[in-house]
UniProtKB/Swiss-Prot annotation:
Organism: Cupriavidus taiwanensis (strain DSM 17343 / BCRC 17206 / CCUG 44338 / CIP 107171 / LMG 19424 / R1) (Ralstonia taiwanensis (strain LMG 19424))
Protein name: 4-hydroxy-2-oxovalerate aldolase
Binding residues for substrate: 13-14, 167, 196, 287
Chain segments annotated as coiled-coil in the UniProt record: none
Enzyme active site: 17 (proton acceptor)
Amino acid sequence: MAQRITLHDMTLRDGMHPKRHQISLEQMKGIARGLDAAGVPLIEVTHGDGLGGASVNYGFPAHSDEEYLRAVLGELKQARVSALLLPGIGTVDHLRMAHEIGVQTIRVATHCTEADVSEQHIGMARKLGMDTVGFLMMAHMAPVQTLVQQALLMESYGANCLYITDSAGHMLPHDVTEKLTAVRQALRPETELGFHGHHNLAMGVANSLAAITCGATRIDAAAAGLGAGAGNTPMEVLVAVCERMGIETGVDVFRIADVAEDLVVPIMDHPIRIDRDALTLGYAGVYSSFLLFAKRAEAKYRIPAREILVELGRQRLVGGQEDMIEDTAITLARARGLPVA
């Protein structure tokens, strides 16, 4: 029997990062219709930093989470909608709102060593009867045994699926194999395993295939790779490769390629590719959504973005510390005698 996986689209959530959270409702509805028609079963919709992400730190979106979610939910014929929630950014009130308007899957995301902060949110989601996913970010930063312990914590809180997340696009296939094999062996058989990759070292597809080989049944990807850094695993490429390998996705390769080419590429503010800064993200192991913040700091303080990113990697900054990026740029500028006023 052919192996079957669930592809989870990131275009309308992780894709908000390179769009500075400014995707219009009409653009979002059009892309959602295309994804739905292509057979994508699960589509994530929120601010790039999850429910409640609208802020000075993370950026103000063109519309509220509720407006985006309602717009997409009204367009779908077969796909389900998920929302991301980072404790400390999103609250249980945001979670209840998403559930009340029809979101069926919630993904509760923490840094890979901080699963304990997810207990309230995972517990509430399970109480509401939602498909509840624990999402361990920046997984390259934790040794295997730590990752296993954190995954087991999320499972004990009620998560029915655990994601290992390569937020920096830093992992290589052997890293994925080592970590996902250990987590898969530790989880209950009925608990699903997922993988979220970034393409900063061009490993998105290869890492996803490694994850599938280890027993992952949910894989994140984005049409045309639209996402932070050099983007997420490109959905259309992953679908084509899976089809060649006999892995069933339920997604039509030509329809998803058309969504990427006709709907997603035209709205890009800049090409999603492995430029020197995105490469630095993957090489240094820095959170992918830091890229635009580093580029803004470069323009303001005349410190090359990649030098800022390398320093962030040295400091081991993690998601949620975006406010430290400007501080780092100021420190580097002062060290060189550059004006910071």
